[in-house]
């Protein structure tokens, strides 16, 4: 037997397990992944049999099949590192699986990846894919008969007047409070202890940052806690979910509840578009994201991959040396995931990224314009469709202007390498060398339909409103 055939030998156990492989996952990579697993499982009595039982009888209950957790939680297979449960779910169930954010362990699993135990379960039938929650339609009054005094416009205007000349800054995860560290401030006039470096006003009625369903305190390779479907009335720690009635003043009695028009959310063909800027100059065409997993990096991509927005391809005659130097440091950039009605940003660059997301700031009780620094290797949830839906449902009862204000939530700004705000010498995002603007199409189109149904505003929208 020559050396080549010796190393290309595939054990019967590996061949047997590969028989259940799904889709067109790379043959050699899948084989190496399964081979590495077999070597680990052979050390445990009954583990191989349990895995084969799970794969051959997917509808039947099965036990956990575990391997030891590595120091960083990841497993290396042929120069590619990944989370073990994601790797084997990809091999045996979902070849298109992109991220750990898409998986949720079943209740029967005793060693789910997120539990941080010494052993981690890789049984692909102990996990399920997160499904996008069905958002209830917004009920828009057919005839606007409420008193304009009930409008929240005054609150938003006051909020705008209280905005600092420069955005406040927060660093992930240091500025993000750990669960249950502060009670929820009920008064819309109270200052928010979460707000970094300031006691200025933040979003009135924003939910507490102790929501256990939020992965903000975890590094990129750690999955968030289990996704909670909307029908589950309890959060993971047994506490009640946030009270949506706290998000806006009570429904004005002038509105006849029966006389409403339902406006449903529809998922668009492209979930977002991304525009690239250098200082205050837009560069190149907008990138329209059809894949739920999008890379924005500093490289060039001759294959014209539809899942990548390569900033290295874009030219600008007005580019100065600072911009050139910054572009060289973008590197792997940012990975954007749209999973289960939530948007995550994972920093793959060696340099930090800086994010201004009003939805994220609302969730954590920060000032609306706060800029959050995401260091290399970390991920942050930057938008939540369900929270947005709850805000929109409340806002329609308080006037056109209040709903219109929510358009600001649907645009996320993100700079590479260089930050901006009170702690940086750059005061505005347009002063940063390289940045992108992300427009969320689903929420924006929903808002547009709601505003169309509402008709004209009581107070004309202007540049100062």
From Swiss-Prot:
Reported tissue expression: Ubiquitous. Highest expression seen in the heart and skeletal muscle.
Question: Which SMART domains does the record cross-reference, listed alphabetically?
Answer: DWA, DWB
Q: Which residues carry this modification: Phosphoserine?
A: 463, 465
Write out the ranges of the annotated region (Disordered): 162-248
Recorded superkingdom: Eukaryota
A Pfam family matched in the record: MH2
Q: Where is this region: L3 loop?
A: 418-428
Stretches with biased composition (Low complexity): 179-210
- Consequence of changing residue 317 to D: Reduced trimerization
Q: Which residues carry this modification: N-acetylmethionine?
A: 1
Question: Per UniProt, what does mutating residue 418 to S do?
Answer: Reduced trimerization
Pro residues biased stretches: 221-232
Where do the MH1 domain residues begin and end? 12-136
Q: Tell me the compartments it is located in.
A: Cytoplasm; Nucleus
Question: What residues bear Phosphothreonine in this entry?
Answer: 322
Q: Which GO terms describe its cellular component?
A: chromatin; cytoplasm; cytosol; heteromeric SMAD protein complex; homomeric SMAD protein complex; male germ cell nucleus; membrane; nuclear inner membrane
Residues at which Zn(2+) binds? 64, 109, 121, 126
Ordered alphabetically, the record's keywords are: Acetylation, Cytoplasm, DNA-binding, Metal-binding, Nucleus, Phosphoprotein, Transcription, Transcription regulation, Ubl conjugation, Zinc
Its assembly, as annotated, is:
Found in a complex with SMAD4 and YY1. Interacts with HGS, NANOG and ZCCHC12. Upon C-terminus phosphorylation: forms trimers with another SMAD1 and the co-SMAD SMAD4. Interacts with PEBP2-alpha subunit, CREB-binding protein (CBP), p300, SMURF1, SMURF2, USP15 and HOXC8. Associates with ZNF423 or ZNF521 in response to BMP2 leading to activate transcription of BMP target genes. Interacts with SKOR1. Interacts (via MH2 domain) with LEMD3. Binding to LEMD3 results in at least a partial reduction of receptor-mediated phosphorylation.
The record's family statement is: Belongs to the dwarfin/SMAD family.
UniProt-recorded name of the protein: Mothers against decapentaplegic homolog 1
Native species: Homo sapiens (Human)
Gene this chain is encoded by: SMAD1
């Amino acid at each position: 037997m020559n050396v080549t055939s010796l190393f290309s030998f595939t054990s019967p156990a590996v061949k047997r397990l590969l028989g259940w492989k799904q889709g067109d996952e790379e043959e050699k990579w899948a084989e190496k992944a399964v081979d590495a697993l077999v070597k680990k499982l052979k050390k445990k009595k009954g583990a191989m049999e349990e895995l084969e039982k799970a794969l051959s009888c997917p509808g039947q209950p099965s036990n956990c099949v575990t391997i030891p957790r590595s120091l960083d939680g990841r497993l290396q297979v042929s120069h590619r590192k990944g989370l073990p449960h994601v790797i084997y779910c990809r091999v045996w169930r979902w070849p298109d699986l992109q991220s750990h954010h898409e998986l949720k362990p079943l209740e029967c699993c005793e060693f789910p990846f997120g539990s941080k135990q010494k052993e981690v379960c890789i049984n692909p039938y102990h996990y399920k894919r997160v499904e996008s929650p069905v958002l209830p339609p917004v009920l828009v009054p057919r005839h606007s008969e409420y008193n304009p005094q009930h409008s929240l416009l005054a609150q938003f205007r006051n909020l705008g007047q209280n905005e600092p000349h420069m955005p406040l800054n927060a660093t992930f995860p240091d500025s993000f409070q750990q669960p249950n560290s502060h009670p929820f401030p009920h008064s819309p006039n109270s200052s928010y202890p979460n707000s970094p470096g300031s006691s200025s006003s933040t979003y009135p009625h924003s939910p507490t940052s102790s929501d256990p369903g939020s992965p903000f305190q975890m590094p990129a390779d750690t999955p968030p806690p289990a996704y909670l479907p909307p029908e589950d009335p309890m959060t993971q720690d047994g506490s009640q979910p946030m009270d949506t009635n706290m998000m806006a003043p009570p429904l004005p009695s002038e509105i006849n509840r029966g006389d409403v028009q339902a406006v449903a959310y529809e998922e668009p063909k492209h979930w977002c578009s991304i525009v690239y800027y250098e200082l205050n100059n837009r560069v190149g065409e907008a990138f329209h994201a059809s894949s739920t997993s999008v890379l924005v990096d500093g490289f060039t991509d001759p294959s014209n991959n539809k899942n990548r927005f390569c900033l290295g391809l874009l030219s600008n005659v007005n580019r100065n040396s600072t911009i050139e130097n910054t572009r060289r440091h973008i590197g792997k950039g940012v990975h954007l995931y749209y999973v289960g009605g939530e948007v995550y940003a994972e920093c793959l660059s060696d340099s930090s990224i800086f994010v201004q997301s009003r939805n994220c700031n609302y969730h954590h009780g920060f000032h609306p314009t706060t800029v959050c620094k995401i260091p290399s290797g970390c991920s942050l949830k930057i938008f939540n469709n369900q929270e947005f839906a709850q805000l929109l449902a409340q806002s329609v009862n308080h006037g056109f202007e209040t709903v219109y204000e929510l358009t600001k939530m649907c645009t996320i700004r993100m700079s590479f390498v260089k930050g901006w705000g009170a702690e940086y010498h750059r005061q505005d995002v347009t002063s940063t060398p390289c940045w992108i603007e992300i427009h969320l199409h689903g929420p924006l189109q929903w808002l547009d339909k709601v505003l169309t149904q509402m008709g004209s505003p009581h107070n004309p929208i202007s540049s100062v409103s």
